[in-house]
Swiss-Prot record:
It is found in: Mitochondrion inner membrane. It is a multi-pass membrane protein. It is an enzyme of class 2 (transferase). Its EC number is 2.5.1.39. Disruption phenotype: Flies exhibit a G1/S block in the third larval instar with normal neuronal differentiation. Residues 1-22 form a transit peptide. Its main location: mitochondrion. GO terms for biological process: defense response to fungus; defense response to Gram-negative bacterium; defense response to Gram-positive bacterium; determination of adult lifespan; isoprenoid biosynthetic process; ubiquinone biosynthetic process. It comes from the Eukaryota. GO terms for cellular component: mitochondrial inner membrane. This is 4-hydroxybenzoate polyprenyltransferase, mitochondrial. CDD domains: PT_UbiA_COQ2. The gene is Coq2. Pathway: Cofactor biosynthesis; ubiquinone biosynthesis.
Amino acid sequence: MYALRHLRLQSARHFRSSYAAAATTKHMLPRQPARVLIGDWSTWDKSRLQDVCSRSSSTATEPVKQQTPLQELVSAAKPYAQLMRIDRPIGTYLLFWPCAWSIALSADAGCWPDLTMLGLFGTGALIMRGAGCTINDLWDKDIDAKVERTRLRPLASGQISQFDAIVFLSAQLSLGLLVLVQLNWQSILLGASSLGLVITYPLMKRVTYWPQLVLGMAFNWGALLGWCATQGSVNLAACLPLYLSGVCWTIVYDTIYAHQDKLDDLQIGVKSTALRFGENTKVWLSGFTAAMLTGLSAAGWACDQTVPYYAAVGVVGAHLVQQIYSLNIDNPSDCAKKFISNHQVGLILFLGIVLGTLLKSDESKKQRQSSLTTSTASSYVPALPQKPEVLS
């Protein structure tokens, strides 16, 4: 009996050990590969766990965000805004100031300039400056692609096709015409006559070292147009020296601007006054500044301007002298900074014209006209009537 009982206990122990071995083989072995690959979780640090979580989340598919119609419109319009340089308004300011000078000079003594005309010319400057940039980029598409500063422009980089740019230019010119027809017929004809300069300017850098001269002739057309728009005709005694002063001013600031690209211009064969003047740039710019100040003084004398005007001319001269004296023609960032500061030149002169006109009275004009009349009358001596002979 004892032997039989012992045999049963041995059999039960053997069965339990066999079952445990089988269970271990069945349930524990599949976990081994994962344990081998991952390791003991208790030994992992926090950064390692975060790395695994980030990898697993990155594999999950995220839904693509859909743009709203307004966002799509903004994305589509962005290259065109860059084409017309909306993000760089300095060109619009430099185009507007000669117009504003002329409008302010044409105002009657003691009166403010015509605000409606200033608004129209400001709108026209924004539109036509953009049109000029579009024309420039159409001509210079291949050149811009080779210049570091301009290679990302919409046409040069292929964001806009040439056909799309031409369609956009047509819209710009149509808007410019819409502004122009708000003026009198003399101004419409005078304004339309400047379009030839706007179109041909980009070509000048291929044939002459003086493209800045042509740019000055186009950019300062408003010095003639502003007076014509308010008075119905152009007073050449005042407008011509003002126009020539603006041309000299443009040569100054655009030569500074051109020094940014002179190395690229040399490689691709583009001409500019920056290359023409070279190391003598400051001497040339000083000469054009002197000519500008002389023209402004002549325009002020023709308009019977007062002390604030001539004070503003003096401040403008000091500003330009400081620009030229401190200019580093081999530092593109300094050239860009000096170029942008010319917006202050235009504003200072405009404020001087406005203040000078407000302080101007009719007395000086009447005295001058009376002196001219007196001198003319004194130079004319009528012949005394002769007594007729009496025949006997």
